[in-house]
Amino acid sequence: MNTAVLFIRLFACMAIGMPVAISLGLSSLLTIFLFSQDSLASMSIKLFETSEHYTLMAIPFFVLAGNLMSTGGVAKRMVRFAIAAVGHLRGGLAIASVLACMLFAAVSGSSPATVVAIGSIVITGMLKNGYTKEFAAGVICNAGTLGILIPPSIVMVVYAAVTEVSVGRMFMAGVVPGILLGLMLMAAVWWRAGKLQLTPPPKASMREVFTALVDSFWGLALLVIIMGGIYGGIFTPTEAAAVSAVYALFIAVFIYKDLTFKDLPKVFLESSKTTVMLMFIVANALLFAHVLTTERIPQAIAESIVQIGMEPWMFLLVVNVLLLIAGNFMEPTGIILILAPILFPIATELGIDPIHLGIIMVVNMEIGMVTPPVGLNLFVTSGVTGMNLMQVTRAALPWLSVLLVFLLLVTYIPEISLGLPNYVFGK
C-alpha cells in the first residue's frame, strides 16, 4: 500500500508538470508524514548529508571543466585533428564528427555539451561538402550521446553515488563500450555515405595530421590526466574532477588563450546554474531513496522476483523496456536517481554485476536523449541546426537502430563492459 501511494504521488506530481526534484521531495515528505515511523527531522538530516557526499563533489568540477572546454577552443582543435585523421574516408567529414564527439566526450562528461561544442563546428562544414542537413543533424545528435558513456561521465558519478559502487570501475567499464559504439556509428556513416555517393576531401599529409595532433595535444592530455591519475593511484575520482577543472581553466586562458579573464564570470555562472539544478535533483532523489530503503520496497520487490523464478536475462529485458519508456519522458539523472535504488538490489539478488547494470542504464539513457518528446539532444541539435524539433527527430531516428543493436550487445555480452575493469582491478 505504501509503495503504491509513494509512486502514485510521484508520477501524479510529474504528470501535472511539477519539476522532478520537487516531485521526488514532496512524495517522500508525504509518505514519511502519513505512513512512516521516521520523524520529519530525518528529512532535513538526509538533505544535509547530501551536501557532505564526497563522490557528488565531482559533479560541479566536471561541469566546470566541460564548460571551459566547450568555450575554450578545445573542441575546435579536436575537430581539426579528427578531420585530418579520417576525413579522407568515404563519409569522412561525418566519420570525423563521430571521432570528434568521442574525443570531446572524454573531457566533457556531458551529451548536450558534446552536441553543442562539436555540432556548431562540423555541421556547417558538412553542408558545404554536399551532406544534407538531415544527415548531419542525425549523426551529431546520436554521436553526442557518447558524452555520458565515455568517461568521465556525470551520469556515471550519479549512479555510483546512489548505489555506492566504485566510480573508478564505472569509468573503466565505459571505455570499451564507448569505443565500440563510436566504431559502430562510424561504420553506419561509411555505409550510408556510399548510398549517397558523397565525395570525401583529399587525404591529409602525415605532416598535417601531426600538426593537428600537436595543436589539440593540451585538450587530449586531460583524458590522460584524469584516467591515468585515477588508475595510477595519484588521486580519487573526486580529486580528478577538481584537477580537470583547474587544468581546463589553465589551458583555456594561458595556453590556447581563447578565454580571457573577462569571460570567466559567465562560464562560472553557467556552471553554477547547471550544478545547482543537478544537485537539487540529487538531494531530493537521495531522500526518495531513503524512503524506499526504510520501507524496504526494493527488498520486497527483489524477494518477489526471486520467488517467481525470473531468470537474469528476463529481468534485464524488463529493465531495458522500463528504461526505454522512462527515457521518453524524463532526463537521465532523474531516471538514474529514481530507478537505480530499486533495480540495484534486485540485480544483486539475481547475480548481475552492479557495474554491468550501471552501463546498461547509461546506454538506455543515451537512447532516451534522442527519443521524443523530451530527448535533450533533440532540442540541442534543433538549436544548433535551426531545424524544428520534428525535423531533427526524423533525422535522428534512422541512426537510433545502431544504438538499439548496441544496447542488446551490452546487455547480453557483459564482458564488453566488465572485461577491462576486471582485468585492471580484478574481479
Regions found by a protein language model. Give the residues of each.
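Alpha-helical transmembrane segments of multi-pass membrane transport proteins
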Residues: 1-427
